[in-house]
Structure formats: C-alpha cells, structure tokens
C-alpha cells in the first residue's frame, strides 16, 4: 500500500507567496487525511496533485488561526465540487474543544448548506497544556439545532494510563493524539499502520501439499484450511513474518510535550514532523511564544529514536532554499545544520510547500 506525505503549507503565522499556512496531507491509497488547515489551504490543494474530494479525515492540532482558518472555506469547496453526491461518507474532523462550535457558527452565519455530512470529535485538553491565564473553558455543546449535515461526534478525554487520546482504531490504522505545551492547548498525532500478514512461503505450501487456489487466500487472511487428506494447515505454518506497519507522527505548535505520551507514541517513528519556528539563537523568544527551534525539535526526535525528522512551520523570514541569498548565515540552511548537530549529523529534511515524501513499506 502506497503512503506519502505532501506539505501544502510550511510557514508560521500567515500565508505568504513563498510559504503557505500550516497544512499537511497524508495519503494512503488515494484516501487523504489533512493535518491542519491554515488560511489558503484549498488554494494550495488546487496547485498540488491532490484532490480535495479525496479528503476523508481532518485533524486540527490547535485553535490558532494559521492552523484552522482555512477549514470553513475548504468544506464549502468540497461541497461545491461534490455536486449532488449525497452518498459521500461523512468527513471525520478531530480537534480541540471549541472546534465544533467554530464550524457551526461559520456555517450558520454564512447560511451554508453542505451536501455531505460531517462529524466533529473534540479532544478535551488538560490545564497543564498552556499558561494558566490562556486556558479557556469551552463546553462541548450538544445542540438540538445543529446544522442538518452535522452528525453527533464524540468528546474524547485523556486516557490517564496511556497519557494519550484514542481517536480511532480500525482494520488498518490506530490513530492517537498526545498533549503538547503551547500558548493554547495543542496536540500531536500518531498514525500507526497495523501489522500485515507476511508473504506465503511457496516452498512450504508445496511441501505440505496445499493446492494453489482459494486455500492460498484463506491462509493469507489468517484462516486455517483442511486438505482433502484431513490435515489442517494453519496460517502460521506457511506465512513468513508479519510486515511491521509504518508510523507517522505530526506535532502541532509547541515548546515541549506534556507527560510521556508523546515520547511513547513517537518512539521509532518512520517520519516525525516537528515545528522549528525560529533558529537556536532565538530559543528564549521561541519558548516565550510556545514554539520550538531546530535543536529542540532534534532533541525530541533523538529521544524518540525517530528514523527521519522533518522540520516545518518556519517563520516567514526563512525563505525556501531555492530563494535563499548566497552567503546567508542566518537563513534556512542554518536551521538544518542546527538540527543535524544534535542528531550526530543524521540528515534532517527542511519542508517546503508541495514537497512530497514517500514512506516505503518495511521489508
């Protein structure tokens, strides 16, 4: 199963001609999951090879405008492009408490009627995710007058034992959220692909006398088969080792993680996407505003033993490599060096708009 990540917006605070506001798409076999939806995300989608109509899930890390102000417009555009296709499955939206009310208000005030259904699942933050004076209590409201296309979502509480939030667990993936520290409650997301059955051992099948055909499919799917001679063949008799799934972790704005949930969920991630708003020389300023530097991001990646670190959410002062001036000592290339110095020169990737990173199947 193919899997890749496309960066639609890699800039902080606001969209610019060189970097869009925060938005990342994880694509699995054509289905797209959107992580954050800053202003202008739908325009970035149109410039990419992705299709907005393929989006089935949306994850919002926190309620700062550069991470979710593009959401109402995107939903409207998907609706317009859907025509009368009312059979479309509901779009699942995950984010902090208050997100459902925001979507409801914008749809109500703009008299918008979507042609598809959507459902908002809200994560309830804890008080230690932001400075005390910035914490606002948003009640999860179950309205009788909800928009006609909105289905009832869940209120998701922290699992205190796991130190994480279980968003969903299906046949292919387990997706969880973990707490981050920022000026307002922020979250990171861990997407883990489940193990898949190993390949059939052709030689063993032959030796055991299993005839080619339907029996192969059953064994591949974990079902035992009985041969004509009465011998039962179990899947473990003929299957090679299971294929370990891939892990992608995407963090919202933060100056650190809260609890050990983030470290556990991001451990040995195949791809870790972490913000690095400012360079290391401005670490105090970054922390003051709830942000990270390359050194901070790399330190977390090293703690998690992440296999690949990608930095994003750069201050708009840091232009993409192709636009950087020759001889600059405080440009984007310096951020790469700062992160790599922590990771013993392990290569670090600097995200740019429309960059696509493939996550290959593990051998």
Swiss-Prot record:
Entries under InterPro entries matching the protein: Metallo-B-lactamas, RibonucZ/Hydroxyglut_hydro, RNase_Z/BN
Gene Ontology CC entries for this record: cytosol; nucleoplasm; nucleus
Residues engaged in binding Zn(2+) 1: 62, 64, 182, 253
Binding, Zn(2+) 2: 66-67, 253, 313
Expression by tissue: Widely expressed. Expressed in heart, brain, placenta, lung, liver, skeletal muscle, kidney and pancreas.
Keyword tRNA processing: yes
Compartment annotation: Cytoplasm, Cytosol; Nucleus
EC number: 3.1.26.11
Cofactor(s) annotated in UniProt: Zn(2+)
GO MF annotation terms: 3'-tRNA processing endoribonuclease activity; metal ion binding; tRNA-specific ribonuclease activity
Catalytic function, reaction form: Endonucleolytic cleavage of RNA, removing extra 3' nucleotides from tRNA precursor, generating 3' termini of tRNAs. A 3'-hydroxy group is left at the tRNA terminus and a 5'-phosphoryl group is left at the trailer molecule
Cofactor binding, per record: Binds 2 Zn(2+) ions.
Keywords: Cytoplasm, Endonuclease, Hydrolase, Metal-binding, Nuclease, Nucleus, tRNA processing, Zinc
UniProt-listed NCBIfam families: PRK00055.1-3 (NF000801), RNase_Z (TIGR02651)
Subunit structure: Homodimer.
Role: Zinc phosphodiesterase, which displays some tRNA 3'-processing endonuclease activity. Specifically involved in tRNA repair: acts downstream of the ribosome-associated quality control (RQC) pathway by removing a 2',3'-cyclic phosphate from tRNAs following cleavage by ANKZF1. tRNAs are then processed by TRNT1.
Family: Belongs to the RNase Z family.
Protein name, UniProt field: Zinc phosphodiesterase ELAC protein 1
Species this protein is from: Homo sapiens (Human)
């Amino acid at each position: 199963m193919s899997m890749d990540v496309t960066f639609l917006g890699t800039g902080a605070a606001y969209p610019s001609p060189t970097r869009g506001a925060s938005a990342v798409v994880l694509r699995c076999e054509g289905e797209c999951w959107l992580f954050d939806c800053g202003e202008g995300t739908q325009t970035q989608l149109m410039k990419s090879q992705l299709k907005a109509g393929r989006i089935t899930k949306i994850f919002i890390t926190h309620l700062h405008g550069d991470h979710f102000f593009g959401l109402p417009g995107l939903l409207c555009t998907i609706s317009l492009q859907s025509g009368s296709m009312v059979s479309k499955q509901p779009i699942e939206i995950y984010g902090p408490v208050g997100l459902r009310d925001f979507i409801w208000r914008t749809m109500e005030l703009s008299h918008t009627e979507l042609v598809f259904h959507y459902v908002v699942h809200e994560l309830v933050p804890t008080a230690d995710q932001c400075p005390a004076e910035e914490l606002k209590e948003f009640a999860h409201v179950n309205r009788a007058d909800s928009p006609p296309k909105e289905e009832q979502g869940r209120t998701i509480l922290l699992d205190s034992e796991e130190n994480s939030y279980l968003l969903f667990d299906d046949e292919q993936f387990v997706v969880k959220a973990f707490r981050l520290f920022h000026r307002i409650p922020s979250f990171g997301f861990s997407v883990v692909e489940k193990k898949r059955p190993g390949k059939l051992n052709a030689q063993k099948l032959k030796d055991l006398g299993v005839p080619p055909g339907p029996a192969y499919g059953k064994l591949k799917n974990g079902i035992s088969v009985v041969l004509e001679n009465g011998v039962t063949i179990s899947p473990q008799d003929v299957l090679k080792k299971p294929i370990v799934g891939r892990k992608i972790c995407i963090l919202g704005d933060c100056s650190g993680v809260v609890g050990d949930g983030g470290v556990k969920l991001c451990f040995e991630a195949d791809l870790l996407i972490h913000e690095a708003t400012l360079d290391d020389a401005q670490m105090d300023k970054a922390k003051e505003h709830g942000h990270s530097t390359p050194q901070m991001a790399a330190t977390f990646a090293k703690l998690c033993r992440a296999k690949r670190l990608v930095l994003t959410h750069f201050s708009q002062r840091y232009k993409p490599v192709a636009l950087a001036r020759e001889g600059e000592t405080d440009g984007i290339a310096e951020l790469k060096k700062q992160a790599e110095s922590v990771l013993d020169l392990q290569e670090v990737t600097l995200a740019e708009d429309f960059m696509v990173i493939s996550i290959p199947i593990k051998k």
